[in-house]
Amino acid sequence: MRLILLGAPGAGKGTQAGFICQRYGIPQISTGDMLRAAVKAGTPLGLQAKAVMDSGSLVSDDIIIHLVKERIAQPDCAQGFLFDGFPRTIAQADALKAAGVRLDYVLEIDVPFEAIIERMSGRRSHPASGRTYHVRFNPPKIDGKDDLTGEALLQREDDKEETVRKRLQVYSAQTRPLVDYYSHWARVEPAAAPRYRCISGTGRVDEITARALQALAC
């Protein structure tokens, strides 16, 4: 099972990636993990990437694609892999295609933006204990207070509505076009393209997992 998982920030990709990887016995691969591992190992590509990052520049798609090919050639990818957060742009998707990396599925987890904003902006946490709440779905007994200590709950910067909306704007501009890219490729070249599937990411976690596994079985 070789697949790409697509979806907006807050759509639940990380949660579902864990279940999918467990079901198929495949690793979850992100470009960040690949870069860190290559730099730590001191590989030629890792040293190239480190020099670029140290200069404050972005690592080129060419280096990323070479890292991807190195990573998926490792033994733990014998049964497949799940790309999380990659490709991020049409240019990366084109480079992946040109490199001949074979894929079975592209799975999109679709959640309306307003639902994502509500889901993320409603999160609250008690930093000292790690306890988490949600103003609508899992509210504390007293608004804004931790249930056990009565201490104030905090909202992470990443979860503030303005920040969430900005992240969704970036996704719409850079990554959302990949949905059209892969769905179009699947229509015009069904024998060569990965199968494109889209599921709803709303509902209980177990319901979404069931949808994902069903989509990957057909």
From Swiss-Prot:
It comes from the Bacteria. GO terms for molecular function: adenylate kinase activity; ATP binding. It is found in: Cytoplasm. Keywords: ATP-binding, Cytoplasm, Kinase, Nucleotide biosynthesis, Nucleotide-binding, Transferase. Pathway: Purine metabolism; AMP biosynthesis via salvage pathway; AMP from ADP: step 1/1. ATP binds at G10, A11, G12, K13, G14, T15, R123, T132, Y133, G203. It holds the Pfam family ADK_lid. InterPro entries: Adenyl_kin_sub, Adenylat/UMP-CMP_kin, Adenylat_kinase_CS, Adenylate_kinase_lid-dom, P-loop_NTPase. Belongs to the adenylate kinase family. This is Adenylate kinase. It comes from Verminephrobacter eiseniae (strain EF01-2). The lineage of its organism: Bacteria, Pseudomonadati, Pseudomonadota, Betaproteobacteria, Burkholderiales.
